[in-house]
Amino acid sequence: MPMSLGNAFIKNFLGKAPDWYKVAIIAFLIINPIVFFLIDPFVAGWLLVAEFIFTLAMALKCYPLQPGGLLAIEAVAIGMTSPAQVKHELVANIEVLLLLVFMVAGIYFMKQLLLFIFTKILLGIRSKTLLSLAFCFAAAFLSAFLDALTVIAVVISVAVGFYSIYHKVASGNPIGDHDHTQDDTITELTRDDLENYRAFLRSLLMHAGVGTALGGVTTMVGEPQNLIIADQAGWFFGEFLIRMAPVTLPVFFCGLITCAIVEKLKICGYGAQLPDNVRQILVDFDREERKTRTNQDVAKLWIQGLIAVWLIAALALHLAAVGLIGLSVIILATSFTGVIEEHSMGKAFEEALPFTALLAVFFAVVAVIIDQELFKPVIDAVLAVEDKSTQLALFYVANGLLSMVSDNVFVGTVYINEVKAALIDGQITREQFDLLAVAINTGTNLPSVATPNGQAAFLFLLTSALAPLIRLSYGRMVIMALPYTIVLAIVGLMGIMFFLEPATAFFYDAGWISPSSGDLAPVVSGGH
């Protein structure tokens, strides 16, 4: 019997998502205006934040852009925020949007070089613990100088390459055109290997993801909010590094120790080894690649290597906005490796553009947080505390908790502006402002690894095409991040409470840094 037109509309709404999920989204859309107009806009604002987090948590059921976008459109329509405020957030974060559009596509054109290097690393280091430490340390080191999103884009690109190589062979297909999203042709014998391989890749990706947070917190270029905080405080690269060190150094070493421990104890989804069959396939693939590599292929690797040097130098020296450097990578890589057809270039943009659209929706939610002043009670309560040491610890905790819920750049920006306003009003001293700036920076960067909401790199990983392939869901990410969340949050808090003030006094006495003075930068707005 043919489907009625009414049923067809219902069936088409959110496609293959479960019926209960569709009902939940419709319920949210009905409830929100009622709460906003009849109960309290503040409550409606927090309800919207909770609903948006729900859509992220259900990312494997339905990509969050559609349900989250419907909620955001309604929020603007009923007046929770304005189109102008959403546009303001997008303009304030244009660099992040450019990064996603161009840099991620640029990385795509360097895939051959990345796969070449990482195949050597993966096959060269047999110990899973050492391999995990290598991924975590490399991601941390790169994130101290590059953007965490760029680093995660590299790791995702490599993981997709590794996954598709094995999947092609396990499916009995030639290393040609193959759909690595379908498991139908895989035999039961290799299915166990595939599950173990997925667990292996999941753990490496999470180690790398946490590595971006460990490295990103240490320098002023590591995360977008670091730049904002450094700008507000008037610190340059060296001073920022030194002022953060009393907190970031203990956290970095404890993070690496945690990496080794979770692998050894095989807890929270870690500890999966690379199956022997998979290793053999990768070894065979590497051997085959070496045999069939022509001079033209070698020339491409050399070109990609030179472009990688340009990429790292340009990012470390901040020669241009990250996205524009990414555009230069696309132009150079395609020009010198002979990719000149439009359809060949189009594939490079497939990965990042859905996430770019999702991030725009996220900024609409951030606009609601700003317009409804959802964080104001927390900020006011913390600023009202008289004891300086307690205030430092509370700032760290409050930043951490809010960064788990919202975008950590937005949280950091809001807090540094509030603290700066307090300094201008004479509520706090310049010395206390400097210490609070450290608490804000570490508070937004470290505990935010708890959920994918806080770190854009984690959110990008969760919503990437790779996540469903290796069965990486929101819940699994939270569980796998848990040991790191506990260690990073507690060690960071200990650093703020016990190491920061004496270490800063020592740095002053040693002449490494001097007490800050002078004008502060103007107020900025921002999300991620």
UniProtKB/Swiss-Prot annotation:
Catalytic activity, as annotated: 2 Na(+)(in) + 3 H(+)(out) = 2 Na(+)(out) + 3 H(+)(in)
An example molecular function term from Gene Ontology annotations: sodium:proton antiporter activity
Gene Ontology CC, one term: plasma membrane
InterPro entries per UniProt: Na+/H+_antiporter_NhaB
Keyword Cell membrane included in the entry's annotation: yes
The entry's keywords: Antiport, Cell inner membrane, Cell membrane, Ion transport, Membrane, Sodium, Sodium transport, Transmembrane, Transmembrane helix, Transport
UniProt subcellular location: Cell inner membrane
Transmembrane intervals: 23-43, 45-65, 90-110, 136-156, 204-224, 242-262, 305-325, 350-370, 392-412, 450-470, 479-499
Membrane topology: Multi-pass membrane protein
Protein function: Na(+)/H(+) antiporter that extrudes sodium in exchange for external protons.
HAMAP family to which the protein is assigned, alphabetical: NhaB (MF_01599)
Family according to the record: Belongs to the NhaB Na(+)/H(+) (TC 2.A.34) antiporter family.
Protein name per its UniProtKB record: Na(+)/H(+) antiporter NhaB
